[in-house]
Amino acid sequence: AATATTAAIVAIFLPVAFMKGLIGKFFFQFGVTISVAVLLSLLEAITLTPMRCSRFLQVGEKRGWLGAMVDRTFDRLAAGYFKVLGPVLHHRAMVIAGSLVLFVASLSLIKLLPQEFVPEQDTGRFRLSYNLPIGSSLDVTNKMALQVESYLASRPEIERYYGGPGGFGSTGVSSGSAMVSMKDLKARPIDPKLGRKLTQKEVMAEMRRDLSKIPGARIALRENSQQSFTGGRGSPVEFTIRGSDWDVLAEKSGEIMEALRTNGLVADVDSDYQVGMPEVQVIPDRNKAADLGISMNAIGETVNAAIGGARAGRFKDGGRRFDIRVRLLAQQREKPEDIARLLVRTRTGALIPLGDVVRIEQAPSLQAITRLDRERAIKISGNIGEGLSQGESIDGALATARQILPDGYRALPTGSSQAFSESFESLGFAFFMGIVVAYMVLAAQFNSFTQPIVILMALPFSVSGALMMLYFAGQSLNVYSVLGLILLMGIAKKNSIMLVDFTNQIRERGVERHEALLEACPIRLRPILMTSIATIAGASPAALAIGAGAETQRSMAIGLVGGMMVSTVITIFVVPAAYSVFDDITSWNDERQRRGVGLFAGLMAPKAISARMAEATHE
C-alpha cells in the first residue's frame, strides 16, 4: 500500500513539473519538490519507521486518559461505520448514483466562483501614476504632483510615499508617479462607516474615486501582485487591438476606452497609444515646384538652414574647433507662418516665397508605432472593474472591443489576461494527465483495469468539497486554488488505496467479498481518519492566515481542507460500494471471456474465438 500510494502521488505531480509556458516555469519547482519529498518519505517509511517502532513502541503499555479517550472515540466510530456499511453495500447502486449526482451538481459552482489569475494581495504597496495632456509643462505637472501628495498625506492608512513629476518613461514632463506604502493591517485605523479596518483593495477603490475628481489628469492605481508573473505594467486586464490601418486603430482604441469607462468593466483604462508633441509638417506641391524650377532638395535645404541652421565655417580657439552655424533669429521662427515667408531660389536664380510651393500643417506626432506578430497593434490595459472578477472584466472588455472593431480588426488578450487564460488551460491539462498517469501506475500496481477506477472515484468528491468550501469562504478560482486541487488529488486517493489494498489482502485468505469489505473497511477507518485529520490540521493555519500575502496561501489551503473533509466522508462509503459493483462486472466478464464472448473477446482473432468456443463445447 505504501509503494502504491507513493507511486500514485508522484504520478499526479510529475505532469505539473513538465507544464509549458509561464505557469510551467513557475510551478516546476513545486512538482519536483513534492515528488522528491514523497519518494524520500517512502524511503523513510520502509527503513527508519520500523526501527523507531521497534525501539519506542511498546505493545500493551497502559494508555493515559487522553489516549484512552481517543481509542474509545475511534472504536465507536468503527462500530457505527460497520452498522452503516451493510446497508450501503446492499443499496450500492443508489449510493453511487447519489454521489455522482452530488458531484455533477457541485460543478455548477465553477460558474459561480469568481475567476482570476492570482488573487489580489494586501501587500501594503501599490503604484500611483498620473498623466496630463502631451505638451503640458513641468510647472503644470508639478502642481498636479503637489495635489496628489497632499491627498496621500491626508490618508491615515498611508505610511510613506515617494515619487515626483516628469522624467518617468516616454511621456516625459507631462506625467509622474508615486510608490505608496501602507501601514500594516493591524496599525490601520478603523473606518467609521464600516466599523472595521480597510483592506488595500478598499483603500485603492476609495482613492480611485477621490482622485478621479481632479480635472485634467488621468490617474491610475495598480497593485503589483501580477507583475512578477508577466512583467511590464502587470495590469490584470490587458489586450491588444490589431489591424492594418493605424488611423483606424487609433480611432477605435479611443472609442473602446470610452466604452469601458462608461460600462465600468475596467477601471483606470489606459493604452500605449501616446501622441507626442505637435510637429510642423512641410508638404511640397511637387507639380508647382517643378513648373517654377524648384527642386525638393532646395526646399529641404532652405527649411533646414533657416530653422535648424547651416554650417558657415569653423572657429579655432586654442587648438579646439567650433562649428559656426547660421539660422534665423528665435523671434523669426516661432510660428508655422514664419516658414511660409522663407525665400527659396529657383534654377534661374529667382527668389520665390516658400509658401507658394508648400503647404504648412500642424499635426500631433507619434512617439512609436507598436507591432505584435508583424501587425500594427495598440495595447489597452486597466484594473478590474469594481465588484467584478478578473475573468468577468477580461471577457467583458474583449466583447466590448470586438463589438466596436470593424471587419479585419481583432482584439486579443496579452500580458496578465493572456497568462490568465493559458494558466487554466495548462493546469487543466496537468489535471487530466495526472489522472491518466495515476491510472496507469495503479493498474500496474494492482494488476487490474477496474480497481484503479474504484480508487480514483475519490477524486471527483474531493473536487466537490474544494469547490463548495471555496464558494462558501468567498474565495476565487485562481492558479493557487487550482494547484490546491491538484495537491488534493494526490492526497485524497490514499484513503481509497488503503481500503482496496486491505480488502484484497483479506480476500486472498479465501474470505468472500462482502465479508472482506465488512472486515477491512472498519479496520482501515482509523488510519484514514488519522491521515485526513492530520492533513486538515496542517492546512488550517494557512487557511486562517492573515497579513501581507496571505491571500495566496488561503485559497489553496481552504480548497484542500474542504476537499479532504468531503472526500473522506464520501469515500468510505462510495469506494466499498464501487468495489462491489466493479468486482461483479469483472467476475461477469471473466465468465463470459471463458466462454469466448466477454467484453474483450472482440479483440481476439476470429479463429481464436472459434477455437475457444470449440474447446468450451468439447468440455
What kind of feature is each model-predicted range?
Residues 1-18, 25-67, 178, 461, ...:
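Transmembrane alpha-helices and their membrane-interface boundaries in multi-pass membrane transporters
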Residues 2, 15, 30, 41, ...:
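Residue-level signature of catalytic and energy-coupling elements of molecular machines
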Residues 17-26, 100-137, 185-191, 222, ...:
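Transmembrane helices with small-residue packing motifs
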Residues 18, 36-40, 44, 437-524, ...:
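Hydrophobic transmembrane alpha-helices and their membrane-interface caps
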Residues 23-26, 30, 62, 66-88, ...:
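Hydrophobic alpha-helical segments of integral membrane proteins
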Residues 32, 421-437, 558:
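N-terminal membrane-entry
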Residues 66-118, 145, 210-213, 239, ...:
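Signature of alpha-helical transmembrane segments and their immediate interfacial
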Residues 96, 108, 112, 127, ...:
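Surface-exposed amphipathic alpha-helical segments in non-transmembrane regions
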